């Protein structure tokens, strides 16, 4: 963003040097990449008057001129210009002047035997124009208002500096001269002098505009105004040309220049369409109702102002008139409807588009313009109609136009947005400022204090905020052109620190410094990962972006590749691929887990963190070459491994068989519950999913909701240490084997055994599962090991015989089974 200091001075009082201001802007967040002294090329150039001209005796093309530059003695200058004559006012380069435009340093010299003490210059030689015919002759009315010897910089209005600012994405207000002026006012604590609106015009809220909802979304707006009796031949006044030129924009004509001027001054892009050309395009008289904003069609094209003919597609948003493309929205206008010398009436467009669609259109066609760069950073729609009004005000100064009607798509929401700002929060975040007493050497006397309410309010008022006093501090109202970056309390605190000066705050950290610590969730998650790793699992990390395969995936608005265009809704598919790749590489087993996020589109967009994993093969031993021994794990072995890994969380996780998970084997899968809440699933992968991956038979998948299991495991009573006396007597074990109906859960059976035993029954474990067709399809054999122990004596068979028999009897009755021999 380039802006001249003279333009800034018309808007804000500047009471410091250009270099000092440049430094303050950079420290304040508006980095000045370069500072150009406009007078650099005309240093040593002064106003002179040609007193006499005589022909050079030794040359037909040279003249000897006596030129008065306000000194006691006039200069003798040999000049070769055809248009030099007596009594004209000229630009004189004195001895020692360097003309950078032609890389020439003026020296006192002798030309064809005649001494020459300077040079009479053309505008080309001064670097003002690209080409010139003869020397520059200064208008007598201008010259008579200045003394001879006046600097050329003053005559050419070049006593100015141009700041080239690097505006960051979080400060879109810096893309306007008024925004930069407000920043300078805040940094220097000086007064603003913004131009007011001379006339306001009637607005018509037309809600029947055909507007693409993606382009004109919330806090967006489209307006179009018909302005008659203008003249495309009229050129811009000098002040307007000068401001555009120093901002790097070429002057075209007054109509185009005013739209560019508002772009620079207010940061609001405008576009002018030639009304007659629009009418010719659609074959009838055009109306504001004909304008629309829509997605382009794949078979359309548009010849634009830069002379390029762009092929359009559905990723480009266009402005249409009677459905015919006339501009690429927010990027560049069409050449066919552009303003030229024959223009007598225009439609003036002012809009705010969704930054995302502007960025997408700009990227697709491969150009970035002054307009698109501002839309991409963000513009407040609350300033748009005022910017349009400001443009029409300037048009009224130069054309005899009738007051137009501004047709707009929506009414402005004048509801104030207030940000609560707490006094105590400011103190906590910023700490005290340090006052250095200049009466003491080496700043040995330092005073520390917190910011006063007056200091806080004054700084926020400097950036246009309005403050309402509250008990806790203030409710702060933000001006529209800062509404893109001042969104939260912390943003306001940052502004206060920036304007006070970061170097003013105490550098010492709070004392004492409390060491950071992990939350209970973080500790539990680390325990969980440790438990899995210790039990042979490897942690993996898969990509959360996947290709589009079904409609229920959440699409990314600006994907880099089609393969990464959507957010994943599961992790298990990637884990199947990881296991398959490992097995193909020669690995005998693959036990993996991952903690990651999945994303759901329905019913509402949601994000869920889960623990997902896969178990394939047995990692306990290697097989002999040529061995036919099966290396696959059974369902219960795999489930036991997961149980062992999760035991570190001290959770009781129950299994309930299910056949409703479509990617799991209907007879070998279960849903997992803890404290009555479903927390995940475990099961063998469905054979249909691995028909082309035969190696992955007997592969098991599991998933757990991280938030649910960590909440259950971190309850306070979970981690209360319970001390037990170390057993001093041996335990006695008995095995029992029954054939059960498969409808009974192992957890139910174990629970019943524990209830049936007395305090001597210490533990119950499932040690064997046997499934055979001879039992019938609905039956299965389970073997349990019961452990008995008395804390005071060694048990005998007679001590537990009756108890063990009682347990067997209860199990037989409860589950309609018989003890196997």
From Swiss-Prot:
Q: Which residues form the B5 domain?
A: 414-507
Main localization category: cytoplasm
Keyword check for Transferase: no
Matching entries from CDD domains are given as:
PheRS_beta_core, tRNA_bind_bactPheRS
Gene3D superfamilies in the record: 3.30.56.10, Bira Bifunctional Protein, Domain 2, Ferrodoxin-fold anticodon-binding domain, Nucleic acid-binding proteins, Phenylalanyl-trna Synthetase, Chain B, domain 3
Under the heading PROSITE patterns, the entry gives: B5 (PS51483), FDX_ACB (PS51447), TRBD (PS50886)
SMART domains given for it? B3_4, B5, FDX-ACB
Name the residues that span the membrane: none
Listed under catalytic activity are:
tRNA(Phe) + L-phenylalanine + ATP = L-phenylalanyl-tRNA(Phe) + AMP + diphosphate + H(+)
A molecular function (GO) held by this record is: ATP binding
| Gene Ontology cellular component annotations, sorted alphabetically | phenylalanine-tRNA ligase complex
Name the residues that bind Mg(2+).
Answer: 485, 491, 494-495
Q: Which SUPFAM superfamilies match?
A: Anticodon-binding domain of PheRS (SSF54991), Class II aaRS and biotin synthetases (SSF55681), Nucleic acid-binding proteins (SSF50249), PheT/TilS domain (SSF56037), Putative DNA-binding domain (SSF46955)
Q: Which residues form the FDX-ACB domain?
A: 727-820
Which InterPro entries does the entry mention? aa-tRNA-synth_II/BPL/LPL (IPR045864), B3/B4_tRNA-bd (IPR005146), DNA-bd_dom_put_sf (IPR009061), Fdx_antiC-bd (IPR005121), Fdx_antiC-bd_sf (IPR036690), NA-bd_OB-fold (IPR012340), Phe-tRNA-ligase_IIc_bsu (IPR045060), Phe-tRNA-ligase_IIc_bsu_bact (IPR004532)
Q: How is the cofactor bound?
A: Binds 2 magnesium ions per tetramer.
Q: Where is the tRNA-binding domain positioned along the sequence?
A: 39-149
Compartment(s) of residence: Cytoplasm
- What cofactor requirement does the entry state? Mg(2+)
Please provide the record's keywords in A-Z order: Aminoacyl-tRNA synthetase, ATP-binding, Cytoplasm, Ligase, Magnesium, Metal-binding, Nucleotide-binding, Protein biosynthesis, RNA-binding, tRNA-binding
Q: Which PANTHER family match?
A: PHENYLALANINE--TRNA LIGASE BETA SUBUNIT, PHENYLALANYL-TRNA SYNTHETASE BETA CHAIN AND LEUCINE-RICH REPEAT-CONTAINING PROTEIN 47
Kindly give the NCBIfam families that the UniProt entry links to this protein.
pheT_bact, YtpR
Q: What is annotated about its quaternary structure and interactions?
A: Tetramer of two alpha and two beta subunits.
The name this protein goes by in its record: Phenylalanine--tRNA ligase beta subunit
Which species is listed as the source?
Prochlorococcus marinus subsp. pastoris (strain CCMP1986 / NIES-2087 / MED4)
Q: What is the lineage of its organism?
A: Bacteria, Bacillati, Cyanobacteriota, Cyanophyceae, Synechococcales
């Amino acid at each position: 963003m380039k802006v001249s200091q003279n333009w800034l001075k018309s808007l804000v009082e500047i009471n410091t040097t250009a270099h000092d201001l440049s430094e303050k802007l950079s420290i304040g967040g508006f980095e000045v990449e370069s500072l150009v002294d406009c007078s650099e090329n005309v240093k040593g150039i002064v106003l002179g008057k040609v007193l006499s001209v005589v022909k050079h005796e030794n040359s037909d093309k040279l003249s000897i001129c006596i030129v008065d530059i306000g000194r006691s003695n006039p200069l003798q200058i040999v000049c070769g210009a055809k248009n030099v004559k007596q009594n004209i006012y000229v630009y004189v380069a004195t001895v020692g002047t360097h003309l950078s435009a032609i890389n020439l340093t003026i020296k006192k010299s002798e030309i064809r035997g005649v001494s020459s003490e300077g040079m009479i210059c053309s505008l080309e030689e001064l670097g003002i124009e690209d080409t010139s015919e003869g020397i520059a002759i200064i208008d007598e009315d201008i010259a008579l208002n200045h003394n001879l010897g006046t600097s050329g910089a003053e005559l050419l209005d070049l006593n100015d500096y141009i700041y080239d600012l690097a505006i960051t994405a979080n400060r879109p207000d810096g893309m306007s001269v008024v925004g930069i002026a407000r920043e300078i006012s805040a940094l220097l604590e000086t007064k603003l002098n913004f131009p007011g609106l001379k006339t306001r015009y009637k607005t018509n809220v037309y809600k029947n505009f055909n507007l693409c909802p993606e382009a004109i979304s919330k806090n967006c707006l489209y307006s179009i105004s018909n302005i008659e009796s203008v003249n495309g031949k009229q050129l811009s006044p000098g002040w307007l040309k000068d401001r555009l030129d120093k901002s790097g924009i070429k002057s075209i004509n007054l109509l185009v220049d005013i739209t560019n001027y508002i772009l620079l001054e207010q940061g609001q892009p405008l576009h002018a369409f030639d009304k007659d050309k629009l009418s010719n395009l659609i074959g009838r008289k055009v109306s504001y109702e004909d304008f629309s904003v829509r997605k382009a069609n794949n078979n359309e094209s548009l010849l634009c102002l830069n002379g390029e003919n762009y092929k359009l597609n559905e990723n480009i948003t266009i402005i249409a008139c009677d459905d015919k493309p006339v501009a690429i929205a927010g990027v560049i206008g069409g050449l066919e409807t552009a303003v030229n010398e024959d223009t007598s009436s225009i439609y003036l467009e002012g809009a705010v588009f969704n930054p995302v669609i502007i960025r997408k259109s700009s990227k697709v066609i491969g150009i970035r313009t002054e307009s698109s760069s501002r839309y991409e950073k963000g513009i407040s729609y609350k300033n748009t109609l005022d910017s349009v009004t400001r443009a029409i005000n300037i048009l009224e100064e130069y054309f005899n136009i009738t007051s137009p009607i501004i047709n707009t798509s929506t009414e402005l929401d004048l509801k104030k947005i207030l940000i609560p700002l707490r006094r105590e929060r400011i103190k906590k975040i910023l700490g005290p400022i340090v006052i250095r007493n200049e009466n003491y050497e080496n700043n040995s006397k330092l005073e520390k204090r917190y910011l006063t309410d007056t200091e806080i309010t004054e700084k926020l008022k400097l950036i246009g905020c309005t403050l309402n006093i509250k008990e806790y501090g203030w409710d702060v109202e933000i001006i529209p052109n800062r509404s893109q970056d001042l969104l939260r309390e912390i943003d306001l605190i940052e502004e206060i620190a920036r304007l006070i000066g970061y170097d003013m705050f105490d550098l010492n950290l709070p004392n004492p410094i409390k060491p950071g610590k992990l939350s209970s969730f973080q500790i539990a998650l680390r325990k969980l990962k440790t438990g899995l790793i210790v039990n042979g699992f490897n942690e993996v990390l898969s990509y959360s972006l996947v290709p589009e395969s079904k409609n229920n995936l959440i699409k990314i608005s600006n994907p880099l590749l089609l393969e990464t265009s959507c957010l994943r809704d599961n992790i298990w598919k990637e884990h199947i691929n990881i296991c398959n790749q490992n097995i193909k590489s020669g690995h005998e087993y693959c036990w993996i887990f991952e903690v990651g996020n999945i994303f759901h589109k329905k019913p509402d967009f949601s994000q869920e963190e889960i623990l997902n994993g896969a178990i394939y093969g047995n990692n306990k031993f290697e097989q002999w070459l040529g061995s036919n021994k099966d290396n696959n794990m059974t369902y219960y072995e795999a489930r036991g491994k997961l149980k062992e890994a999760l035991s570190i969380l001290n959770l009781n996780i129950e299994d309930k068989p299910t056949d409703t998970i479509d990617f799991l084997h209907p007879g070998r899968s279960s849903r997992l519950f803890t404290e009555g809440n479903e927390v995940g699933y475990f099961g063998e992968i469905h054979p249909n999913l691995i028909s082309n991956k035969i190696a992955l038979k007997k592969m098991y998948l599991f998933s757990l909701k991280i938030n649910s299991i960590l909440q259950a495991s971190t309850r306070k009573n979970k981690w209360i240490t319970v001390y037990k006396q170390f057993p001093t007597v041996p335990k006695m074990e008995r095995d029992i084997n029954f054939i059960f109906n498969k409808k009974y859960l192992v957890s139910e059976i174990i629970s019943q055994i524990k209830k049936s035993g007395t305090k001597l029954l210490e533990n119950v474990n499932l040690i064997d599962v046997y499934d055979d067709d001879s039992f019938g399809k609905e039956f299965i054999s389970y073997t349990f090991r019961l452990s008995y122990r008395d804390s005071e004596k060694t048990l005998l068979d007679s001590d537990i015989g009756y108890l063990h028999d009682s347990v067997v009897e209860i199990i037989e009755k409860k589950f309609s089974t018989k003890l196997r021999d």
